[in-house]
Regions:
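Trp- and acidic/polar-enriched beta-sheet ligand-binding modules for extracellular glycan
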Residues: 880-942
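Structural beta-strand segments of beta-rich domains
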Residues: 715-719, 859-861, 870-872
Length: 942
């Protein structure tokens, strides 16, 4: 199929290619109409004058207002909709004369996934002539952009949006592991590089907005979109989301649009129902788990886009909620970008949720709530026309429209569309997309995402010199589809696990392969509840795999899931291996040969039998196009696996919800004795807990130190520890820091992730690590749903997983009153102390001008303030026998002996109390420092 597509591309798959495009793509794109394109600016409205919005040096908000004032209602409403790209809604790959008669003659907000190669779910990539190579693709998007710049009245450029959670979704681009796999790297810098590459390749291809990252937090392992989350911990999701956005938006190369806001990933029973309705969470859990990543990524990374979600929360659809899209998102979080709906989410207000009577009412509710841009699988007319009617009928204020359009224009200005609307470096696109350096980072991401779950008897790594015959089987052994799904690159070359092993062992070992079974059987998913017997064909295929295993030194069985079992609208009722996979594994294990199980899947699986009877297990998730190479490197010891779980593996689906973080004792039942006379009624504990992962080497943790051990709510503490590689191989360790609030006014989590670092250590090498603990780690939502830091003890735990804690210590948080009393108690009995002439110190407080304390340059007098007083001025009476000018400083201290200068000046007048004001703050001590000799202070008043 790939060869056929490639041939079509070479010959040209469109008549427009022959009619409008030169035979060879130029190295640089230059628009045809030169009179619009002035030196240093573009005359978008073609009036011959540099308007404010056309002036790159003008202030951002001034440019927005100038353009908005020139826009008609038709032009404004066209900015509030997405046009789905080629072969979805848009039937043309390049502009046609008909476009001047269609809705977007007045412009369009965004064009989504145009010419990215995706057609529909289950179909092969498009064979259109403009999907590849990169230079031709960029040229085609430029031509579309040129229509909006040159052939619309105001020339407002379009925002080309696209998916990008594992590399930009294009016919070809650098292909990374799925986002769940990327989460398992625990590597902030790597995630930033993934974002940087994805954003850079997107812009070189002509896209300006990437729908990434996914900021949903995984809570139910049955959920179909579990493959798209970073993990279960809101802290980890936030930390990696921040890095992804910083990479994507580097130098404003593209806008990053995080999704799905809000409370999206925990719908009832993991059933999607197309609207993802009725999420099962308390208000406090929504805040602690699901809102937390969005809040931090918006505030700390400046994310420019947010996608609103399909679901309701407590009966209120998010898509129509002013509370979620305006009060919380813009008001509380300070979001300044634009909100785009998930596809058809507006329609769902009346087709699914039943909170609007028709499309017009759904449009009104959405726009009033805070929606800027409607994304849809349908014609943009279906949104824009009722929107215009609402304004004309008085059902919606045009000022509301203005507010929504301001946000859209702000993003377009920020990403440079009004200064450089075209991707002019066409030759650069061919050099940049899938370049060697990017591919190397993709391979490293694949390696770092893989988790070693079991390695009994140190079966792994395999000795390539003594392993002469290897049996490989399983439905995922020679499968590449997991790397070519929607939301990422579609037609790249994939190295399968089989190919990776064959390449690694070439000339050294014989590889015997048979599939063994399909991913699912003919009765699946019903076969999860009814035990259908094996067919003759199924038994014969398993028998072939068994015969290969008997001949081999080791059997590598590659099982898991794929597009049939995981993905959007692919939630499950079981977490067991689907189809005949377990029967295949059991048959291979029964041969008595060493077995290595490799899992390639998009969610945790309950592999209890494998954990008990198979000696070595690797979890690879969907490891990207380089997955086969990465797994071969790990199997044969060229890379030491260091990934750690960001999700919990339940032993059975009956334990769900079963995740991290959790409330104390909420995931374990009473009873310890099994059997007919016991008191145990259900399975307890995780198969593999959050943070778990093995290595080919060992690590020792030591020397935990917390400094300071006592802080106030707005102060921070530093946690230090040492980690040493005590094994014989170099390797990575993900060092995890957890925190527990010992006593609080509400029930808090048993432990919460508070920090992590992935480090690489050679044998016998040690490294000191440090973590900062501050307010964001300590605060809780109190009974009044207010974020507060309550005084008390917090246990800090460093370990190799959430259940493998190696070191712990206690941090104490004091309230301000306790701290003030402690400082007061530590003060000397004397209220005044001096650097010299202490016998005269009290003279400055006796209210007599003729008695004084005298000092020389560098001398000082210090006053202890009562109960941490807030001071913003002090009155001082200076005297000097020669009346020459003298300078001095006023300093404040919050305790601990450190003073900061808050005032420097010259004595205004001698022999008189003069007030000297400064910026006030709470302080425990005030000091007056002399900068000249023989200066006296007669009186001081506060």
């Amino acid at each position: 199929m790939k060869n056929l597509i490639a041939l079509t591309l070479l010959l040209g798959g469109s008549t427009l290619l022959c009619a409008q495009k030169p035979a060879k793509t130029p190295a640089t794109y230059k628009p045809v109409k030169s009179e619009m394109y002035r030196k240093g600016w573009i005359d978008f409205n073609k009036n011959g004058v540099k308007d404010v919005y056309e002036d790159p040096s003008a202030p951002l908000e001034a440019r927005i207002e100038n353009l908005l004032q020139q826009m008609t209602l038709d032009e404004k409403t066209c900015q509030m909709v997405t046009l789905y790209g080629y072969k979805r809604v848009l039937k043309d790959d390049l502009p046609t004369p008909e476009w001047k008669e269609l809705l977007w003659k007045d412009g369009i907000g965004a064009i989504d996934e145009h010419l990215n190669g995706f057609q529909q779910w289950g179909l092969p990539p498009s064979d259109n002539a403009y999907v590849w190579p990169a230079s031709r693709h960029a040229w085609a998007l430029n031509e579309v952009q040129r229509f909006f710049v040159e052939d619309t009245r105001l020339g407002i450029p379009v925002d080309f949006t696209n998916e990008g959670i594992r590399g930009v979704e294009s016919y070809r681009a650098t292909n990374f592991p799925t986002q769940l796999g990327l989460g398992h790297t625990w590597n902030r810098e790597l995630i930033r590089q993934v974002g940087l590459i994805t954003g850079r390749e997107a812009r070189m291809l002509g896209y300006t907005n990437v729908y990434a990252p996914i900021l949903d937090v995984g809570r139910d392992q049955r959920w179909g979109r579990y493959e798209e989350v970073y993990g279960e911990s809101p802290y980890l999701v936030a930390e990696l989301g921040i890095e992804m956005v910083r990479g994507l938006q580097h130098n404003h190369q593209v806008a990053a649009t995080g999704k799905h806001f809000a409370a999206y990933s925990n719908n009832k029973g993991a059933r999607e129902g197309m609207a993802r309705v009725d999420p099962q969470m308390s208000p406090r859990e929504v805040e602690n788990i699901h809102i937390y990543p969005f809040k931090r990524v918006i505030r700390e990374a400046g994310m420019l886009g947010v996608m609103s979600s399909y679901n309701d929360y407590d009966g209120i659809p998010v898509q129509g909620s002013y509370y979620w899209l305006t009060t919380r998102l813009r008001g509380e979080m300070g979001f300044r970008g634009y909100v785009v709906s998930d596809s058809d989410a507006v329609e769902y207000l009346y087709t699914k949720h039943g909170t609007a009577k028709d499309m017009k009412e759904a449009v009104r509710q959405s726009v009033e709530a805070g929606l800027n841009v409607r994304c849809t699988f349908r014609s943009p007319d279906s949104f824009v026309l009722p929107l215009r009617e609402l304004v004309k009928e008085g059902g919606l204020s045009e000022e509301v429209i203005n507010d929504r359009v301001r946000d859209i224009l702000r993003v377009k200005f920020l990403i440079g569309l009004f200064d450089a609307p075209y991707q002019t470096d066409l030759a650069g696109a061919d050099r940049e997309v899938e370049k060697e350096e990017n591919e190397a980072i993709a391979l490293q991401a694949s390696r770092e995402s893989i988790v070693l779950l079991k390695n009994a008897g140190e079966l792994l790594p395999l000795d390539i010199n003594s392993t002469k015959k290897i049996a490989v089987c399983g439905p995922n052994a020679n499968e590449e589809g997991y790397a070519l799904t929607h939301y990422g690159p579609l037609a790249v070359e994939v190295t399968t696990v089989l190919e990776g092993i064959q390449e690694k062992t070439k000339g050294k070992a014989e590889v015997l392969y048979t599939k063994g079974c399909d991913l699912v059987d003919a009765h699946w998913p019903e076969s999860e509840i009814i035990d259908y017997p094996l067919t003759d064909d199924e038994q014969a295929e398993i028998d072939k795999a068994v015969e290969n295993a008997r001949q081999a030194d080791v059997a590598i069985v590659v099982l898991g899931g794929g597009q049939r079992t995981c993905g959007e609208n692919k939630s499950r009722t079981s977490l067991d291996l689907p189809g005949r996979q377990l029967q295949l594994l059991q048959a291979i294990q029964a041969t008595g040969k060493p077995v290595v199980l490799i899992l390639i899947n998009g969610r945790p699986l309950s592999i209890n039998w494998a954990d008990k009877f198979v000696p070595a297990i690797l979890e690879a998730w969907y490891p990207g196009s380089k997955g086969g190479t990465a797994l071969a490197d790990i199997l044969f010891g060229d890379y030491n696996p260091g990934g750690k779980l960001t999700v919990t593996f339940p032993k059975t689906v009956g334990q769900i919800p079963f995740n991290f973080p959790c409330k104390p004792s909420s995931q374990i039942d009473g009873g310890k004795n099994p059997g007919p006379t016991g008191n145990m009624s259900r399975i307890n504990g995780a198969l593999y807990p959050f943070g778990y992962g093995l290595s080919y080497t060992t690590f020792e943790y030591s020397d935990l130190d917390i400094t300071p051990r006592i802080i106030t709510p707005n102060e921070s503490a530093t946690v230090r520890l040492k980690v040493t590689n005590t094994g014989k191989r170099a390797g990575d360790e993900v060092v995890q820091l957890y925190i527990r609030d010992v006593l609080s006014s509400i029930t808090t989590y048993e432990k919460n992730l508070a920090g992590f670092q992935r480090i690489h250590l050679e044998p016998d090498e040690a490294q000191e690590l440090s973590f900062t603990i501050d307010r964001k780690h300590l605060e809780l939502l109190d009974a009044d749903m207010k974020w507060v830091v309550e005084p008390g003890d917090f246990v800090l735990m460093a370990g190799a997983s959430s259940e493998d804690i190696r070191l712990n210590g206690t941090l104490t948080v004091e309230d301000y009153q306790t701290r003030a009393k402690a400082i007061e108690a530590q003060k000397p009995a004397k209220r005044v102390s001096t650097s010299t002439n202490p016998e005269d110190a009290e003279n400055v407080l006796d209210e007599k001008i003729n008695t004084a304390w005298q000092g020389n340059k560098g001398d000082y007098i210090t006053f202890a303030l009562k109960n941490g007083a807030k001071v913003d001025k002090v009155a001082i009476a200076f005297t000097r026998d020669n009346n020459l000018p003298a300078t001095f400083e006023i300093q404040l201290s919050g305790g601990g002996g450190q003073f900061l200068t808050v005032y420097s000046g010259t004595v205004s007048e001698y022999g008189k109390l003069i007030s000297y004001p400064f910026k006030g703050t709470t302080a425990s001590d005030l000091r007056i420092v002399l900068n000249d000799d023989r200066v006296s202070i007669a009186e001081v008043k506060f």
